[in-house]
């Protein structure tokens, strides 16, 4: 489920913010030193980039009213040297665009890259959903961005700003396809789009808006389009970035990691490039996978790539992509059953859940981690505190991190198809059963780390310079006695995974049942 933070949760954390010792050091270097992060593969260009003047202006605009200002990008990611179009519909006579690169930047979270001149605004037609629930806009381009050298690789938010200073985000990512960086940061845009109900339909919600808070509506869409904005309810158009991904990006850029940037669509289209890297970093909610995406990951792991799943419910829904009038891979298909018309001609592409017929391949087959459910709230209970994951956290066996777990959860299931030597590093009781932190790595092989909770990224949140500035409640607060040890454990994963096949130095040891 996409990250959300309500007012009650935020107000309940004010005391933590006021008195917490978890808040970051005044400098990136001091924080990195405190975490003992000197063994991390680092990038001089990224360290230099984050030393540049940051800006909090990205947080200074209230969200525009629904239907007043909306936009989307021509692609989820763009390689340096290419261009990207923004398609905007607005009731305002004009607007401007401010483009921010997201990162650490002295704790301010972003750097302003450029500001457009005034753009003439006009209302563009919202198409009616077709018989599959697809809302596929065919808008005219409002502005083209030339992605030159002034656009370093990274995650971007374009902020559409109206004359009354309200705004709406349009996310996109800048790649460097020549990169040989140790880490691939991957933004889970396929999952963002699955939950995006702009235009009235998503892969969960439809005309009836029934079911569990609108989820699993019988009239939901079977095909959704990337040619549409993200809804206002998705963090003012930012998709699922600010809640389920930004806390990790903020930390990673603070540490100056040797990192390149992909979306999940890039895994589909250029997954062969994983061989140039040491680790793939999957973030808070990475649920929707095409066969090409899954094959790229499993092949790379068998060849020594490390993969971290810092969320839960990963590789669960099987999808395929189709072209639209506006480009290839702009439509995402997910029937969730054998009613998928492709069953008649190519059943292996039928968009069932991955573990169901005719696919029959659960995520546990190479991870040892199986989806458990949506009621994953609870406290994390540490096992095997002497292992590498918990080093320098100050935690001992049986230590409890209160309220560290939430959202969906994964666990180790003995009756599932699992790889050998699945090691359980924490096992915790949650509302829906048991949540497990797992690790698996064959001798000299690639390692796979699974946090087992949808809140691992949430637990990294630590934005002391930003909370008072945010419009609404988009940024999660730190959690007392949780944020530091989870940050430390995350750095331990990065330290191990950034050095090559994790099994060469840290093969997993099967945890007794």
Q: Residue locations for each model-derived region?
A:
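C-terminal segment of N-terminal export signals and the immediately downstream linker at the start
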Residues: 3, 24-58
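N-terminal export signals
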Residues: 9-31
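Structural beta-strand segments of beta-rich domains
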Residues: 82-86
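Aromatic-Pro/Gly-enriched surface loop or interdomain linker
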Residues: 90-95, 99-103, 110-117, 164-274, ...
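Extended acidic/polar, glycine-enriched regions
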Residues: 95, 135-179
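Helical hinge/lid and interdomain linker segments adjacent to catalytic or ligand-binding clefts
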Residues: 124-137, 143-146, 150-152, 237-323, ...
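Extracellular low-complexity, Gly/Ser/Thr-rich intrinsically disordered linkers
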Residues: 254, 267, 416-511
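An acidic, glycine-rich "communication" segment
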Residues: 315-432
């Amino acid at each position: 489920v996409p990250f959300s933070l309500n007012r009650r949760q935020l107000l309940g954390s004010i005391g933590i913010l006021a008195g917490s010792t978890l808040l970051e050091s005044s400098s990136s270097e001091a924080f990195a030193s405190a975490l003992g992060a000197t063994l991390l593969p680092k990038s001089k260009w990224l360290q230099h980039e984050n030393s540049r003047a940051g800006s909090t202006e990205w947080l200074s605009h209230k969200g525009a009213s629904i239907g007043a200002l909306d936009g989307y990008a021509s692609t989820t990611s763009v390689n340096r040297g290419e261009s990207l179009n923004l398609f905007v519909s607005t009731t305002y006579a004009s607007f401007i665009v401010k483009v921010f690169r997201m990162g650490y930047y002295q704790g301010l979270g972003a750097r302003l890259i450029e500001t457009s001149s005034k753009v003439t605004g006009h209302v563009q037609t919202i198409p009616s959903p077709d018989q599959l629930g697809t809302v596929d806009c065919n808008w005219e381009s409002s502005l083209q961005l030339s992605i030159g050298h002034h656009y370093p690789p990274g995650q971007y938010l374009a902020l559409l700003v109206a004359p009354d200073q309200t705004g709406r985000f349009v996310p996109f990512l800048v790649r460097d396809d020549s990169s040989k960086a140790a880490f691939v940061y991957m933004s889970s845009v396929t999952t963002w789009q699955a939950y995006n109900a702009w235009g009235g339909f998503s892969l969960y919600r439809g005309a009836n808006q029934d079911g569990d808070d609108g989820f699993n509506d019988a009239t939901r869409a079977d095909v959704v389009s990337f040619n549409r904005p993200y809804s206002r309810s998705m963090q003012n158009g930012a998709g699922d970035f600010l809640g389920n991904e930004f806390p990790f990006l903020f930390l990673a850029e603070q540490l100056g990691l040797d990192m390149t940037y992909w979306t999940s669509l890039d895994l589909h289209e250029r997954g062969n490039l994983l061989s140039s890297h040491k680790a793939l970093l999957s973030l808070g909610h990475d649920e929707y996978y095409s066969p090409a995406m899954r094959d790229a990951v499993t092949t790379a792991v068998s060849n020594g790539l490390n993969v971290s799943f810092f969320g839960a419910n990963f590789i669960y829904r099987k999808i395929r992509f189709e072209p639209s009038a506006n480009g290839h891979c702009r439509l995402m298909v997910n029937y969730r059953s054998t009613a998928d018309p492709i069953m008649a001609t190519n059943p292996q592409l039928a968009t069932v859940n991955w573990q169901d017929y005719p696919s029959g391949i659960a995520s546990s087959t190479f991870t040892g981690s199986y989806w458990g459910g949506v009621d994953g709230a609870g406290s994390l209970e540490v096992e095997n505190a002497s292992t590498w994951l918990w080093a320098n956290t100050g935690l001992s066996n049986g230590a409890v991190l209160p309220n560290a777990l939430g959202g969906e959860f994964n666990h180790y299931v003995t009756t599932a198809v699992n790889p050998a030597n699945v090691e359980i590093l924490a096992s915790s009781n949650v509302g829906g059963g048991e949540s497990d932190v797992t690790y698996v790595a064959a001798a000299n092989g690639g390692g796979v780390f699974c946090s087992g909770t949808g809140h691992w990224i949430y637990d990294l949140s630590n934005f002391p310079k930003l909370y008072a500035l945010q419009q609404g409640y988009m940024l999660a607060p730190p959690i007392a006695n949780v944020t530091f040890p989870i940050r430390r454990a995350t750095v331990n994963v990065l330290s191990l995974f950034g050095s090559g096949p994790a099994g060469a130095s840290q093969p997993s040891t099967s945890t007794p049942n």
